């Protein structure tokens, strides 16, 4: 199992819209991908900051399944056009980890 981990940030006023887009568009689309095994979205806002951080952890059966989703440059984030509009900044690289323990 491969965990695909990525971070992005929205301005505070776009955070709810971005979360809604993930819930209603992005994740339903991911669930249709062969080899996709679910994921998590973590959201964090810190006092005094105008940005909200989102961390996406998506699980794939194999690196081949990741490549089928993301293409040959699988270390580059994949965005819906609307998601990119809502994000104020993004990590340019996605990290991939072998899942060794899942309880």
Over which residues does each language-model region extend?
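Mobile, glycine- and charge-enriched loop segments
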Residues: 9, 61, 72, 79-80, ...
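Non-catalytic surface loops within mature trypsin-like serine protease
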Residues: 12, 61-62, 98-103
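Short amphipathic alpha-helical segments
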Residues: 12-38, 74-82
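Active-site-flanking beta-strand signature of metal-NTP-handling nucleotidyl enzymes
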Residues: 2-8, 55
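Short amphipathic alpha-helices within nucleic acid-binding modules
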Residues: 16-20, 51, 62-74
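Glycine-rich beta-strand-turn "strand-cap" elements at beta-sheet edges
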Residues: 40-51, 78-103
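Short hydrophobic/aromatic beta-strand micro-patches
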Residues: 9, 42, 57-59
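Short, glycine- and small/hydrophobic-rich beta-strand elements in well-ordered beta-sheets
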Residues: 27-55
